[in-house]
Amino acid sequence: MVSFTTILVAATAALVAANPVPPSIDEMREIYVKSRDLHARGGTPSSTGTHDGFYYSWWTDNGAQATYTNNAGGSYSITWSGNGNLVGGKGWNPGSARNVTYSANYRPNGNSYLSVYGWTRNPLVEYYVVENFGTYDPSSQASRKGTINVDGATYQVAQSTRTNQPSIDGTRTFQQYWSVRQQKRSSGTVDMKKHFDAWASMGMKLGTHDYQIVATEGYFSSGSSTVTIQR
């Protein structure tokens, strides 16, 4: 990642050469922000669509240096490093209570999740069935509802509220639902119906499904992930 000093020195020198009046602090800050954003866009821009018969979603706040690649079939790869948030993967649109079979070479350094990830509307819900994670268990700072046994493992169920945060409908306030596997794995089959049914029994209602992907997410961390899902 290019440092603040490198960007600021280069940009300020260019400004001074063009204008003998020294730039103000505000002008230097504006130069840095613009230069930083241009550098961040050296990664893969956010996008959604279809590829080789699968839906894909890739989102980044441009804070990290991150590259997303759609590979053949149900496979994708992500590499990332730096200060920012990113999430992407392949799957389906709309989502459903399907069995999701996946395999991954998942190598996080820091805060990251490997999960079945999706959204619903009415109510607006962002949900995660976390199969593996880096240094931070996302259920630890949420309201824990209990544990369930699914697919031969224990999952911690939790719920949290996101206030004025990015969503599939723009900046909104919405609920997050979590099932976090306590015995981490990077391949297997996830029975989404069992998770959805368990959530419903705890008062965690879903709405009409939007997309559903096997996602890699990174937050102020680094790592690499190659994931393949089955039809």
Swiss-Prot record:
Gene Ontology CC annotation, any one: extracellular region
Signal peptide: 1-18
SUPFAM superfamilies linked to this entry: Concanavalin A-like lectins/glucanases
Subcellular location: Secreted
Residues bearing glycans: 99
Keyword Heme annotated: no
MF-aspect GO terms: endo-1,4-beta-xylanase activity
Enzyme class: hydrolase
EC assignment: 3.2.1.8
Superkingdom of the source species: Eukaryota
Pathway: Glycan degradation; xylan degradation
Catalytic activity: Endohydrolysis of (1->4)-beta-D-xylosidic linkages in xylans
Entry's Gene Ontology BP terms: xylan catabolic process
Record key words, sorted: Carbohydrate metabolism, Glycoprotein, Glycosidase, Hydrolase, Polysaccharide degradation, Secreted, Signal, Xylan degradation
Active site feature: 126, 217
Alphabetical list of Gene3D superfamilies matching this protein: 2.60.120.180
Ranges of residues in domain GH11: 42-230
Family named by the database record: Belongs to the glycosyl hydrolase 11 (cellulase G) family.
Function: Endo-1,4-beta-xylanase involved in the hydrolysis of xylan, a major structural heterogeneous polysaccharide found in plant biomass representing the second most abundant polysaccharide in the biosphere, after cellulose.
Protein name stated in the entry: Endo-1,4-beta-xylanase 4
Organism: Pyricularia oryzae (strain 70-15 / ATCC MYA-4617 / FGSC 8958)
Gene name, Swiss-Prot/TrEMBL: XYL4
